A protein has these predicted regions:
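N-terminal hydrophobic/helix-forming segments and targeting peptides
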Residues: 1-356
């Protein structure tokens, strides 16, 4: 399993609207897997693979092929610089959903036109030694956090400007069968969009459908790149690839866990944005059973993902979500199980040749 690629994807900074570094990495990885690639006006990378006959040769039929679109968003939650004050403190505005309880004492990377600068993020206020009990027990709002990059104020003001972006700065780690990193939401999907097609390509299996993999932008702020990409592609089938919750940890009732690590990929039934097509659910389930690929059915009470955009584009499409359970989501210690990741890759690669 190509974990090195997953690490590189996760460690590459790219917040909503500034995914270009992630896109450039993906463009290098997908060479030879697709017949056409282009970048749309929203910055999404649209990759087309035409139908294939025996031994992987491009097959030209007399009828228009079924178009299957895989949607994999590139952006991670992060921040934009909103102000640099006269003391050199950097203030930020979130791009995506943060829980302020997870922002204390974090190392960050401030990405500017003048280079990337390491910094630390903390809330304003007194340290524990001199703070009152009330101050210690109060969780600050996100807007109270600032960044210190350790440079004189005049240099900070010359170097960092409003609109520069900020990501968490932590390396990806392997821990047994787990991978821990920032940005697994949703570089997991980027990895799957590459590796599932790589597995399909190396298998030499024929597929009658046209496969479009869209590495989309700005999902974390409203599925924006997926909406425009889906409208342009107008797929017959949309597969939203994403992470989902794995709350199989202390403090959460078992019935609320959503997924459990090590039990396979998630066959996504519904969330707050769309309901998966029943026939597609049955088809993926049949493929998983045939190939003995572990899976678990999942329902997420809220939230959304790019599959919704494909389902609602133009005249509409049949859509489904394929997801990977992730612990500690939207933190710098997001955790997946590589067995679940491999299962998601395998089921996508096995499903595509079944589409007429």
């Amino acid at each position: 399993m190509n974990i090195d690629l997953l690490k590189r994807l996760c460690e590459t900074p790219g917040v909503p609207g500034r995914e270009e570094r992630v896109r450039e990495l993906i463009q290098k990885e997908v060479k030879g897997l697709f017949d056409e690639t282009r970048v749309d006006a929203m910055g999404s990378l649209i990759c087309r693979r035409f139908p294939r006959g025996a031994k992987g040769k491009v097959a030209k039929g007399s009828k228009k092929p079924t178009v299957v679109m895989l949607l994999c968003h590139m952006d991670e939650i992060g921040f934009y610089v909103s102000a640099v004050d006269n003391k050199g403190w950097i203030w930020v505005n979130p791009a995506g959903g943060f829980d302020a309880r997870n922002l204390f004492s974090r190392r960050v990377l401030v990405c500017t036109d003048n280079g990337d600068f390491k910094g630390v993020m903390n809330p304003g206020g007194r340290p524990i030694h001199i703070s009152s009990p009330d101050e210690r027990n109060k969780v600050p709002e996100t807007k109270q956090f600032f960044i210190d990059i350790g440079l004189p104020a005049d240099k900070v003001k010359k170097t960092v400007k409003v609109g520069d972006f900020v990501v968490m700065d932590e390396p990806a780690l392997e821990m047994g069968t787990k991978v821990v990193s920032k940005a697994l939401d949703n570089r997991v999907a980027c990895w799957l969009g590459i590796e599932a097609i790589r597995k399909l390509d190396s298998s030499g299996n024929a597929h009658a459908c046209e496969v479009v993999v869209a590495f989309t932008t700005q999902e974390e702020v409203g599925l924006r790149g997926a909406k425009t990409a889906s409208h342009a592609v107008q797929p017959d089938i949309g597969i939203g690839i994403d992470v989902t919750l794995a709350c199989d940890t202390p403090g959460v009732p078992e019935e609320e866990s959503v997924t459990t690590h090590g039990k396979g990929f998630g066959l996504h039934i519904k969330d707050g944005s769309f309901i998966s097509d029943k026939k597609l659910v049955d088809e993926f389930e049949a493929v998983a059973k045939k190939h003995r690929i572990a899976y678990q059915r999942t329902i997420l009470a809220a939230g959304g993902q790019d599959g919704a955009a494909a389902q609602q584009a133009a005249a509409g499409a049949r859509a489904i979500g394929i997801v990977v359970g992730t612990r500690y989501i939207h933190t710098v210690t997001e955790m997946i199980d590589t067995r679940d990741l491999g299962a998601a890759r395998d089921v996508i690669a096995a499903y595509l040749p079944t589409v007429d």
